[in-house]
Regions:
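Positively charged n-region of N-terminal signal peptides that target proteins for export
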Residues: 1-4
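A short, sequence-level motif marking secondary-structure junctions
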Residues: 83, 104-108, 125-131, 181-182, ...
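Gly/Pro-enriched, hydrophobic low-complexity segments
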Residues: 96, 157-253
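N-terminal mature ectodomain segment of secretory-pathway/periplasmic proteins
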Residues: 22-116, 149-155
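Flexible, processing/modification-adjacent segments and terminal tails
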Residues: 22-30, 39, 103-176, 196-199, ...
Length: 271
């Protein structure tokens, strides 16, 4: 009788194990796991951004299968970041001329486009993976909300090629993010851009070529697609952690730019 009981318990455990393995994390559990994996506190990153024409056509009037790069639209960025407090993005053209300046320091925010011939919006320049990497749940939630993901439901997601991901968001609405279920690295963000005729374009942001620096993983390459056609690629060219940021100099620069042109500066600002 005892042997039969042991056999039954073992059988039940074997059948139960796969179900438990595929039971998704709660939001709180996911936030805890991600917090444990954040090693950086302050960092400076430099990126190179390539821009492509997603709707370029060939001589036959069909969409080009090879992305058509627009070198004149490329730019580079210098990003200063302190987890949970500071995000400053200097966006420059290839000659080093400032195109856009983004300054976020606790409750202060300045976002200003500086070239009338090349207007850049805030959503064009934000480094989404940095905010999502934060130790702080509010910052991670904000990173999702900035890309249209409000609903925080978590489920497993099986892709067409049978890869398994963690999914945050609402799949049916088209607003969701996919994570690696083992490392919790951000794999992709999905959104829909609605047009005036009530149709939409599928926006997909892919985070790839993960590397490790100072015990922290990060995506070296981020690619942006509209209806599966590449329109932007961001590559991290340089990265280092810092003991302090040059915040005084950057703050002075922000105030000078604010007085030069009309900009947005608010207290208690939330994107």
């Amino acid at each position: 009788m005892r042997l039969i009981l042991i056999f039954l318990i073992g059988t039940l455990f074997c059948f139960a194990a796969p179900a438990a393995a595929f039971f998704p994390l709660s939001w709180d559990d996911l936030m805890f796991q991600m917090e444990k994996r954040m090693s950086w506190n302050r960092a400076k990153l430099e990126t190179v951004v390539q821009v492509f024409d997603p709707f370029a056509k060939n001589a036959d009037g069909e969409f080009s299968k090879i992305p058509v790069e627009l070198p004149a639209r490329s730019f580079k960025q210098v990003i200063h970041w302190k987890d949970g407090e500071i995000l400053i993005v200097e966006t420059q053209d290839e000659q080093g001329q400032l195109l856009h300046f983004y300054y976020e320091n606790k409750d202060e925010l300045l976002s200003i486009s500086l070239n009338d011939n090349r207007t850049l919006e805030t959503e064009d320049i934000l480094p989404h993976q940095l905010r999502f990497r934060s130790r702080y749940e509010d910052d991670r939630s904000r990173a999702l909300e900035e890309t249209g993901i409000i609903y925080k439901a978590i489920a497993y997601h099986i892709s067409d090629d049978n890869h398994v991901f963690l999914r945050i968001g609402d799949f049916e609405s088209g607003h969701f993010a996919l994570l690696n279920p083992k490392t919790y690295d951000l794999i992709s963000i999905h959104n829909r851009l609605w047009l005036e005729d009530e149709t939409w374009l599928e926006l997909k942001i892919v985070f790839k070529n993960y590397e490790t620096y100072r015990w922290q993983t990060y995506a070296k390459v981020t690619e942006y697609f509209l209806d599966n056609r590449l329109f932007k690629r961001t590559t991290v060219s340089k990265i280092r952690t810092l003991s302090r940021l040059p915040i005084k100099e950057l703050q002075e620069q922000a105030w000078k730019l604010r007085h030069l042109q009309t900009a947005t500066l608010q207290n208690n600002y939330a994107l």
